[in-house]
A protein has these predicted regions:
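C-terminal anion-handling pockets and recognition modules
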Residues: 121-122, 131, 135-182
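Short, basic/hydrophobic alpha-helical segments
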Residues: 69-90
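Generic structural signal for small/hydrophobic residues in well-ordered secondary structure
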Residues: 5, 43-47, 94, 136, ...
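A short alpha/beta connector and helix-capping loop motif
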Residues: 14-28, 104-117, 128, 148
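A structural signal for isolated positions on well-ordered beta-strands in alpha/beta enzyme cores
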Residues: 42-44, 90-92, 124-126
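Acidic/histidine-rich, metal-coordinating catalytic segments
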Residues: 86-100, 128-131, 136
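RNase H-like polynucleotidyl transferase catalytic core
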Residues: 26-34, 111-140, 153-154
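Extended, low-complexity cationic-aromatic segments
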Residues: 1-76
Length: 182
């Protein structure tokens, strides 16, 4: 069973955290945005819950999540599952517009028909109820990850954010999915 979701990793906004200080409260400094520098990074993730073991697969996106990028991510995950000898992927995800788009739904139907004829990993899609992200077990892991990679003294580069995120979840850092994949 795999729980899929997307998250934005901000390079500027700090997650809500509590901390003790022997000095007075810290004052925020305004930092100027560099031209062409991304403020946030979009990332797809799947949490595989195999009973006692949990595994995360992450893949960053060059721009933002859209249907074509979702399909590319699904293909990438399916290739890994096929290599492991899996036959069915129970995919649990929310109702984001790029999940329920006609393009993605058509692709999943076509993929499952092709798998029925030729073999491979079938997708058994389970959508969560509308406006209920707390039902997806991957959601709390995003918050823990955001707190784990925080750097209060300086702004991280995009590469540093990606490296820290992957190190926190114990997964490999792959090339970001390009926006023009299909």
């Amino acid at each position: 069973m795999g729980y899929l979701d997307e998250v934005w990793w901000s390079r500027l906004a700090q997650p809500k955290m509590h901390a003790w200080s022997f000095q007075g409260p810290l004052r925020l400094r305004q930092k100027k945005k560099q031209k062409g520098e991304k403020q946030a990074l979009a990332c797809y993730g799947v949490l595989f819950d195999e009973g006692t073991s949990k595994q995360m697969l992450l893949r960053f996106v060059e721009r933002r999540p859209i249907s074509a990028v979702t399909i590319a991510f699904l293909e990438w995950v399916l290739a890994g599952l096929a290599a492991e000898g899996k036959r069915v992927w129970v995919l649990v995800w929310d109702n984001a517009s790029w999940h329920i788009s006609k393009k993605v739904r058509r692709w999943i139907r076509a993929h499952n028909r092709r798998v029925k004829r030729e073999g491979g990993v079938r997708i058994l899609e389970c959508r969560l109820p509308v406006q209920s992200p707390w039902l997806n077990p991957i959601e709390p892991t995003w918050l823990h990850g955001k707190r784990a990679i925080v750097e209060p003294s300086r702004k991280l580069t995009a590469q540093e954010v990606m490296e820290r995120v992957c190190a926190h979840y114990g997964c490999a850092l792959w090339e970001p999915i390009p926006q023009d994949v299909l």
